């Protein structure tokens, strides 16, 4: 009997991002609203690792993870700079982040799911583009009817924005009103989200090509 080597698919590289021109997306979930620890994908190994305990009272209000086969590089940074009219904006050199809305209770990450993009948050984090795509779980009984972020309940968007604006802030920074490192400079709809995803996908293909040439 032949022995086959063990192989675990890498969540960043192995899944196909989309098969229908960014209408439906494969999403890798890292953390859930039930996690008191922030997990993130270790890009080198493909394993889910502990990044840090969630600070203070902040808990992510939705499923949160990344889009496989995306990378926020040159094209993503340049586009963010164009849209915000700021110079020197770079991609954060990470996969594109995604927030997935669902009414179901999903208690653990390290899973793949299919979701539809409805929009996104244009975020600048310490001078780098760090957009968050907002998507809805396919066939969700509540959120699946949402086609665009303009249809999303304002309270849901408020919770998501509040999390990203405060999850790195200390009480001292908030009390003193110190300048925020994270800025939400815009909210956009489905078509713009698909553009952002496409650019991150193109950045990924360039990044993988450059990495292969170096190796």
From Swiss-Prot:
Organism taxonomic ancestry: Bacteria, Pseudomonadati, Chlamydiota, Chlamydiia, Chlamydiales
Residues that bind substrate = 38, 52, 64, 167
Residues that span the membrane, as ranges = none
Its biological function? Catalyzes the hydrolysis of inorganic pyrophosphate (PPi) forming two phosphate ions.
Which residues does Mg(2+) 1 bind? 92, 97, 130
- UniProt-annotated binding residues for Mg(2+) 2: 97
Name-wise, this protein is Inorganic pyrophosphatase
Q: Which GO terms describe its cellular component?
A: cytoplasm
Q: Show the Pfam families listed in the entry.
A: Pyrophosphatase
Cofactor needs: Mg(2+)
Where is this chain's protein located in or outside the cell? Cytoplasm
- Can you state the subunit structure given in the record? Homohexamer.
What the entry lists under InterPro entries is as follows: Pyrophosphatase (IPR008162), Pyrophosphatase_sf (IPR036649)
Name the chemical reaction catalysed here. Answer: diphosphate + H2O = 2 phosphate + H(+)
Q: Which GO terms describe its biological process?
A: phosphate-containing compound metabolic process
Q: EC number(s) for this protein?
A: 3.6.1.1
Keywords from UniProt, A to Z, are: Cytoplasm, Hydrolase, Magnesium, Metal-binding
The entry assigns this protein to a family as follows:
Belongs to the PPase family.
SUPFAM superfamilies, from UniProt?
Answer: Inorganic pyrophosphatase
What GO molecular function annotation could you give as one example from this UniProt entry? Answer: magnesium ion binding
Q: Which organism is it from?
A: Chlamydia pneumoniae (Chlamydophila pneumoniae)
